[in-house]
């Protein structure tokens, strides 16, 4: 009887102490462009949550990499038009992060609807999340 009780108690302890891995999620994608003298400036942002964090002493550290693809109004896909790494450390658990991208589009880009795809990877777990948004280039 004691043996079964110890096995059950050990099993419950393991379950209670196990850490649930969160799922990486991108949300609130936005993009827009405004006209400049010789083209446009495109701004895009996406928020990210559910990433792994290393606890180092009293600090929490997250590391995300991102890539931005742009699909032009005539269907041409430009992969990796912007790339980067967000390496954030703060003294409390990080709830979410915002990733921003800013690009200059010259006058060779035609007016129309464009699609921005944000691909985010949690460097600590390898999880990926993808989200897109649309914007219009107008004269």
Language-model region placement:
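Contiguous segments within soluble domain cores/interaction surfaces
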Residues: 18-99, 119-120, 131-133, 137
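Sec-dependent N-terminal signal peptides
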Residues: 6-9
């Amino acid at each position: 009887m004691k043996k079964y009780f110890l096995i059950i108690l050990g099993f419950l302890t393991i379950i209670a102490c196990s850490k649930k891995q969160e799922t990486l999620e991108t949300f609130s994608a936005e993009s827009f462009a405004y006209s400049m003298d010789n083209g446009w400036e495109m701004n895009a942002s996406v928020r990210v949550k559910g990433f792994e964090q290393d606890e180092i002493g009293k600090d929490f550290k997250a590391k995300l990499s991102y890539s931005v693809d742009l699909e032009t109004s005539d269907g041409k896909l430009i992969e990796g038009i912007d790339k980067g790494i967000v390496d954030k450390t703060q003294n409390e658990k990080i709830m979410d992060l915002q990733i921003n991208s800013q690009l200059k589009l010259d006058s060779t880009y035609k007016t129309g609807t464009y699609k921005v795809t944000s691909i985010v990877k949690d460097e600590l777990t390898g999880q990926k999340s993808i989200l897109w948004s649309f914007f219009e280039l107008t004269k």
